[in-house]
Amino acid sequence: MLHDFSWGGFVARASLASSVQPRATDAQTYVDRAYAGIDRLNADWYNAATGIWDNAWWNSANALTTLADFTTLRLDEANELNIGGFMRTTFNNAQKTQVQTIKTMNQGLVSSTYCIELDSGCMAKRDFIGKRGFDDFENDYYDDEGWWALAWIRSYDAAGDQEYLDMAVSIFQDMRTASGSDCSVGVYWSKDREYVNAITNELYLTVAASLARRVSEKSSTYLDIAKKHWDWFSQSGIINDDDLVNDGLDSKCKNNGLQTWSYNQGVILGGLVELHLATGDNFYLVSATKIAKAAIKALANDDGILVETDDCELSDTHCGTDGQQFKGVFIRNLRYLHEVAPQDLFKSFIIKNADSIWKNDRNKNDRLGVAWTGPYVDATGPSHSSALDAIVAAIAVADD
């Protein structure tokens, strides 16, 4: 792998070697838009010293996943954008960065506050006193760990760097300490061991199934974990009568009735795709397709554009930096499902949302906001990378 340095020595340049990939003419519009969006994401929000985008920890794992997905689709453009260098810099620097986290929940929406690095001044704040910090992409929240594990799995797929896959394996080892809840095999959200939520369990299943296909010496172990977890998840009641995934389970291990966030409808699709690919069983695709169709029906507006479950995009909070990431997670995983179980509905939904983002949710500098319907709201790193997920997904489906 070829390395040099740019950005004053902060960002390593790494060329990703692979065979030349054909370019689909009709998809080129989305390639050009994704190229502009990735360039803007990295120029405006990336901190090379910490390896993080916009000081947002778990969101940065999603931004990295988006870059990795673009790389698998368009290698030449990825090399022009130095995506391999951003991967390597994030791998080297983010795992050494002191990150301490506070998460609160208000009416079902989680809000994360991060203190990045001890010398930033935030450690003097009372809220952060006594909070734990971890190295190697681990922290107090198992869902955060799951996002990073998936990011390194996708980075491994794109770059072929064994260190990335090894990191995902290491992260999952810590995630396994989340087991032991009162809700059968369900895992806890955090190391406080109080809440069994959907997203952590979806990520747990998805990471296990993904590793089963990539770590041959432990494939049967990971696959057994993933299969048992889906058996539990599908029967736990967390999927409601409308085939939508609620936020989590209550203290009696019953569906808590909280919001059906878009990302909870998305991650499970990716997990079921990985289970299908690992087993060859179409049963998993049937379940995934049912959830995907229910989510589109419930969360799309009259124009077919994805809107968060509580219409938070144009509220005073604009969904917060956590919620701003959600819709991209759904579209990304819908694309994964479409690749193995294609549906005209899925393709048209992805294209329609990518087009609306570019037309209605972009400013003159190619920043992408949270309201995919428009009007444009000042973008953040999370809103921008989330919208990029839709544009990258459009590349994949435009000419299938």
Residue ranges and their predicted role:
Residues M1-A24:
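Fungal secretory targeting signals
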Residues P22-D143, A158, V196, F283, ...:
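CBM-like carbohydrate-recognition segments
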Residues S60, E145-W148, L165, N201, ...:
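Residue-level detector of extended alpha-helical repeat arrays and alpha-solenoid scaffolds
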Residues T65, L150, S170, T206, ...:
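Residue-level signature of alpha-solenoid helical repeat scaffolds
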Residues L67-F70, W152-S155, A208-L211, L272-L275, ...:
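The core hydrophobic/aromatic register in alpha-helical repeat solenoids, strongest
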Residues N139-W152, A168, Y195, L205:
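Mobile, glycine-rich extracellular loop/lid and propeptide segments
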Residues Q162-F233:
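Aromatic- and glycine-enriched pocket-lining scaffold segments that form the walls
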Residues V207-Q259, G266, G271-V286, I291, ...:
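Noncatalytic carbohydrate-binding groove/subsite architecture in carbohydrate-active enzymes
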